[in-house]
């Protein structure tokens, strides 16, 4: 008998249907030589400190650092979990073979490996690796099962991540709580490898806002033929300098000195990875990162979209032949897919690039018709569907006109933009109107060199503005790029290696900061609470709050996943870091409160 183990009951049912397993038992489905069972996400977890030695049960500075000689796992204490595990254990003990059907990612690999280890599974194990839950995808996956050994590095990276989080979280939380909490306070100062640098980003931004001192400046503009031109030499920090130039040029004619027209093109937006989808949903609809993750997970389980926990915006070449069929399935978008029928779809490196795809490709529709969706599911699906269609549309062609002029010695400039062929933009016309992006197209009057006439100059008073508070959208981007502000897509791809956390965990980190009372949300804006600010002020060690240092850890974990970095080396470095941290904090006699 072959035992298949999935990550949740609904996925197990989809797999059982494809395999022809029809007989339902308590905790599994059987038939056609298969027993299909399931977990409920994590059934096992790393042991707690007191599971290793009674000396680590009570919190004390003398017991730090806590570094077990060998890490172990245990069942999560829950009656439902214990019951399901006994069923899984019984099936695996008698199995001729096991097929790991867990989510195709690092966390999914860890969940199932721990269960198999705890169950004492001894038979050969194969791995099902699929990017969607459609019948076609499941059948295709079972036709090319892989040996579990091929995913050893993925498991090792997940294990190192879990142990790293345990070592730093357990030791640093006890260390700071016992060393610095005041008097008889029972407050726990919770510190985490990812949550603390993320909180530091929000705290530091708030301090920048509070410490910001607005500075006054003036900009010189002039209006000629109902068109506003800007002075090219920048702003004035002294009003008298700007006023003097204004008075000098007021009586003079404005002369057009140069007119340049260049044609260019805008490419369609990239397909979504999880973070960019969360960013767009927060920007457009105000959905939290956690809400978006739950929604896209639901769409995946309904077989409507592909695997969501991805960090690439590209497709692999093997998806290309399936694209016409997916487009055909988008029946509600027939007005947009009709022009693509019967033509050879374009295949560009901006969309199809095997070198940019590792475990999974970008999030796209599967072609299954979306029935019975909630309004939120419908809104998220709409974003994904339109992006997918758009990448096969022609580029948007535009003409940019730059006009230079002068009045006396003062030089001015204005630019205009005219859409020549909208191309892919036709899919987003409604969105453009809703977002009031009326500056997208600015058509200038016809200007000719050497024409001249009266103009109306004015000096506009301005003030420098403070940085904006983070929203979930901008915080996700900052986590992705380790705190660096990056707008360019290509640079964003390069920075992903060093981001804080993983796409699949960032929403949970943000939710943790809310739940622990370290951060609050006001409308879309995020603010640290006094408790959150106090915690970051308390931490002097850059190791704990530096986004860049945490990003380097993430890079090593990704290298372990690719077999380019030794897990043992990572663990040795981690243990040394924790030991040094404990020593430094215990040696600190200053008052940080």
Predicted regions and their residues:
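Conserved short loop/turn motifs at secondary-structure junctions
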Residues: 1, 102-104, 185-188, 261-270, ...
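Intrinsically disordered, low-complexity regulatory segments
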Residues: 1-170, 453, 466
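Basic, low-complexity terminal or inter-domain segments flanking catalytic cores
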Residues: 2-3, 81, 118, 173, ...
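Amphipathic alpha-helical transducer elements in NTP-driven molecular machines
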Residues: 9-16, 33-36, 40, 78-92, ...
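OB-fold/S1-family RNA-binding modules
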Residues: 49, 94-99, 227-237, 242-249, ...
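C-terminal or mid-to-C-terminal helical accessory/interaction module adjacent to the motor/catalytic core
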Residues: 71, 80, 86-89, 93-94, ...
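Metal- or metallocofactor-binding catalytic centers and their adjacent structured scaffolds
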Residues: 238-272, 278
